[in-house]
Amino acid sequence: RSTELPKVHSSALPSRNLRRDADAIRQKWEIVVIDGGARVTEHAYAAVGAANWLIIPVRPSKVDLDATAQFLDIVQADMAKRDDLSGGLLLNQFQEGTSISNVAKKQILEWDFPVFSNMLHSYVAFSEAIWQGQSVVEYQPKSKAAVDICKFFEELKEATQW
């Protein structure tokens, strides 16, 4: 890993420990990313409870849109009780020019929740990078996929003021 890239640490915590340990983890790391999963589960509830910023990826499919709508109900209920929780929806695996992607984009823009202007397209480089144990920026730094990630990260830094 290049010394120019930030150090990344990965760990897995059971749902019951996530809320309790979140503050201690935040003290140790500048940025903490919690993958809460794609379904409304105990772990997803715990991840929302431990978070102060949510990135909610949404794939352009009926099943994913329905699941995201259910998840947003949980998120918005939590946001109503707290003033330290923010977030945004990120279109993921978007395919330009397809009717399903266009319908999905239109639908999420109608929801009462912020949507990132940048999106992640459906590029093979994302999957290949994972197979290599790398980020797409490491794997193919000049690829369209890497450009997508970099644009999204710049927007995220601005939104979160990191």
Segments from the language model and where they lie:
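P-loop/Walker-type NTP enzyme "switch/lid" segment
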Residues: 1-38, 42, 81, 106, ...
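Short histidine/acidic/glycine/proline-rich micro-motifs that form metal-
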Residues: 61-62, 92-96
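Inter-motif core of Ras-like GTPase G domains
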Residues: 39-62
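Conserved C-terminal guanine-recognition region of P-loop GTPase G domains, centered on the G4
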Residues: 68-81
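Beta-strand-loop-alpha "switch" segments that mediate conformational coupling across diverse proteins
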Residues: 95, 106-134, 149
